[in-house]
Amino acid sequence: TFRMGSIPFLSKAAIGAQMDVDADFKTNKFILKENALSLNAIRATIDGWVAMTEKGMDMDIKLNSNEISFKEILSLIPAIYAKDFDGLKTSGEATLAAYAKGSMIGDSIMPAFDVNLNVKNAMFRYPSLPAGVDNINIAASVKNPGGSLDATTVSVNPFNLTLAGNPFSMTADVKT
């Protein structure tokens, strides 16, 4: 379970890992090779390295999900995952890719990072409901060039869907 304040972002999520790590304890550098992470039904590879320094951590880490089904993305939503998830009809594909590169020192200096989610031609429908959600297309990214978290930007363009025949479209750019 992950909460930010009083908002639950993940509830009773299943997390797994298969890790192959080369550890150099003299330099405090850990190299990640052929690793896999899972969060509910989503599987991703992770590779790169992390090094502990006197001030914090240096890193160059990449995460990639390749193509995953839209149903796997929906598995992250607690209400959907817990209730009638097996009967949920879905189609569409998604990709999730991320990286973090640079130094992390305390809470004030962060590495550069980029997280990208793309959903194409997706839909979902519960058999017991008269209509579903169709034509789901999302391109979302969270980016930071490194340094302060205040430099983080969030972009969503597009976020499109059709609910019971009614189209909905949104774009968002959030900067501090």
Features from the language model and the residues they span:
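Short, flexible segments with low predicted structural confidence
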Residues: 111-112
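Hydrophobic lipid-interacting interfaces of membrane-associated proteins
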Residues: 1-55, 62-75, 90-105, 115-175
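Extracellular loop and loop/strand-boundary signature of outer-membrane beta-barrel proteins
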Residues: 6-7, 82-86
